[in-house]
Amino acid sequence: MPRYALRIEYDGGPFAGWQRQAAQASVQGAIETALGRLEPGPHTIAAAGRTDTGVHASGQVAHCDLVREWDPFRLAGALNAHLKPLPVAIVAAARVPEEFHARFSAVERRYLFRLLARRAPEVHDRGRVWRVPHPLDPEAMRAGAAHLVGRHDFTTFRAAGCQAASPVKTLDALTLETVEGMNGTEYRFHLRARSFLHNQVRSIVGTLERVGAGAWTPDQVREALDARDRAACGPVSPPQGLYLTGVGYPADPFA
């Protein structure tokens, strides 16, 4: 059966996450339903990352096996036609070798978290950023973030129910971009690693927000990391500011 990789964009707001749910809308379920309208099913797709409820994606990757050969351009177009009016888009499709696996072949995942500092409620970005009503110190947040880059035991920064075999991960990059706007300042956290623990990004950003607000010192981030205790973590940031922006492979399947 021919295998295809799909690059996917979605607004996570209406969905109970990526993973198929019995009685709730999911991104996986929406795409599998669309595939079933192209070819007899059942269809099961596998993704590089299983995003949680409310988390968005601009560069999710999944793969599926189909019965017949499809022109990738036509496959993407046909799926998009059947996905309407849901906020899900197949940005690209590509024929890939049968050994390609969206999750297990991945060597890098990239996330963006958008944090907006302004007193007024957000309007155009409602559901797409985390807004806090107080100013933040970006240099303090950068100093705190520096403690987290590299290979560490991230027990403090993972969900209590995380099923990963080990809490040790290598965070390859954690950078902070400041975007000044007429109606507020947006802080964009860019994170890159081979893989992440459940709630790791949201736990990190929630903790760094406390540093930016002056409630924590940058050195307290290191103390929390060294504690290897979930109770030492700062607040977990809400999901709506988080985006899966890209997945890296040894060879780009869409090139």
From Swiss-Prot:
Report a single Gene Ontology molecular function.
RNA binding
Gene3D superfamilies (alphabetical) = Pseudouridine synthase I, catalytic domain, C-terminal subdomain (3.30.70.660), Pseudouridine synthase I, catalytic domain, N-terminal subdomain (3.30.70.580)
SUPFAM superfamilies tied to this protein: Pseudouridine synthase
Report the domain of life of the source organism: Bacteria
Q: Which GO terms describe its biological process?
A: tRNA pseudouridine synthesis
Q: What is its EC number?
A: 5.4.99.12
Instruction: Please indicate if the UniProt record lists Manganese as a keyword.
Output: no
Instruction: State the active site.
Output: D52
SS bonds (residue pairs) = none
Question: Can you state which reaction this protein catalyses?
Answer: uridine(38/39/40) in tRNA = pseudouridine(38/39/40) in tRNA
Binding positions for substrate per the UniProt entry: Y111
Q: What are the alphabetically sorted keywords of the record?
A: Isomerase, tRNA processing
What is the protein's known function? Formation of pseudouridine at positions 38, 39 and 40 in the anticodon stem and loop of transfer RNAs.
Q: Which family does it belong to?
A: Belongs to the tRNA pseudouridine synthase TruA family.
Assembly, in brief, is: Homodimer.
Spell out the protein name for this chain: tRNA pseudouridine synthase A
Gene source species: Cereibacter sphaeroides (strain ATCC 17023 / DSM 158 / JCM 6121 / CCUG 31486 / LMG 2827 / NBRC 12203 / NCIMB 8253 / ATH 2.4.1.) (Rhodobacter sphaeroides)
What gene is behind this protein? truA
